[in-house]
Amino acid sequence: MQKATYCDGSAIYSGLPYQSANGLGYDASQQQYLQALHAESEYHRPACSLQSPGISAGLHTSNEMSEVCQQINGTQATVTDTSDNKQPPTAPSGPSSPSSLNQIPNIDSAAKNPVHVSPTPSTRKHIFPWMKESRQNTKQKSCSIISVESCAGDKSPPGSAASKRARTAYTSAQLVELEKEFHFNRYLCRPRRVEMANLLNLTERQIKIWFQNRRMKYKKDQKGLGMMPSPGAQSPHSPVSLSSGGGGGGGSAYLSSMHSLVNSVTYDSPSPASYNKPQSNTYSLPTSYPPLNNCPPPQKRYQGTGTATPEYDTHHIQGNNNYGTQVQGSPVYVSGGGGYSDSLVGMGASVFGLTHLPHPSQGNIDYNGAITMGNSHQQGACDSNPCTFTDLTPHYSQGRIQEAPKLTHL
């Protein structure tokens, strides 16, 4: 770093005027001019830097030359180029006077001897004030950054030493308010979180983290108790409740009974029986139904295939006793006939909602194809005439209805 390390040759050879090769010479009277220039510009490069290598080769180092200049003059002498006409003096390229050449070794020896030189104000000026300020500013900035990181422990990066957060200790009042809020709403919106933070003197981040931890604890507790319902579906552990009404049952009972009957029945006839459609006047139905108290209803006669007298078995009628309450009132599908026959064991009218249909529950059953209603069906003064039902279905096969298994998959 060459800052003001050279000094003028006239400062060294102040009492020895000499004539240079180009006609310019130094004299002792030039020191006043140099001092005036030194007062104007102190930090410019000196005129010694313009010397030729002939004289500068005799000097060892610039530091030693600066120390010699400080001993002789005490101040740094600098020469600037004022104009092109006034050229600064340069050292002679040719051989100079013998006296000046003889003093160069003496200068070298004098430069080697004073190694330890007390610092002068000129040497102290090498460290400028702005340099000290910059170093202090950098130290202050680094200290301020460290202090900010240490103070704001929550916002520090995870790798730094100040990243370890202190465990937040909530007071009992804060915990009560947080638990109360969690009881009503497990997820807080931001306006409510800001309100809670202002109310409890906490930060939004602390409240958000508390709610996250509380939700995880709630889920863990629910899983431990086995009470967490699967979303959008019913839990497989909870049983399916079948609502059975008193005597008939509900719609679910009807579905389960029908499902069990369909699965248990075996079909051996590939095609259903063919029915001969009677004429339109075969069915003589009354157009009006008078009330039962006034007059007896007319005799209703259903004529089907006429001479076909199907054979009945009491087997499938007694098999209904093995079914539950839901199955007793359900119609029995008999193979081969392609139709349903009402079971006579239980009254299942409420299962199907067919309360308007007559059920021969108290009638006498004739297994030759006719069901005759007895006198026990009378209400008030009304005498019920026997209704003859000629069945439309052909021969029923024996023992086709088996006991239906209980369903567990519904």
Swiss-Prot record:
SMART domains: HOX. Keywords: Developmental protein, DNA-binding, Homeobox, Nucleus, Transcription, Transcription regulation. The keyword Nucleus applies. GO terms for biological process: anterior/posterior pattern specification; embryonic skeletal system morphogenesis; regulation of transcription by RNA polymerase II. GO terms for cellular component: nucleus. The keyword Disulfide bond does not apply. Residues 79-126, 222-249 are annotated as: Disordered. A motif (Antp-type hexapeptide) lies at residues 127-132. Residues 163-222 bind DNA. GO terms for molecular function: DNA binding; DNA-binding transcription factor activity, RNA polymerase II-specific; RNA polymerase II cis-regulatory region sequence-specific DNA binding. Pfam families: DUF4074, Homeodomain. It is found in: Nucleus. It comes from the Eukaryota. InterPro entries: DUF4074, HD, HD_metazoa, Homeobox_Antennapedia_CS, Homeobox_CS, Homeodomain-like_sf. Sequence-specific transcription factor which is part of a developmental regulatory system that provides cells with specific positional identities on the anterior-posterior axis. Belongs to the Antp homeobox family. This is Homeobox protein Hox-A3a. It comes from Danio rerio (Zebrafish).
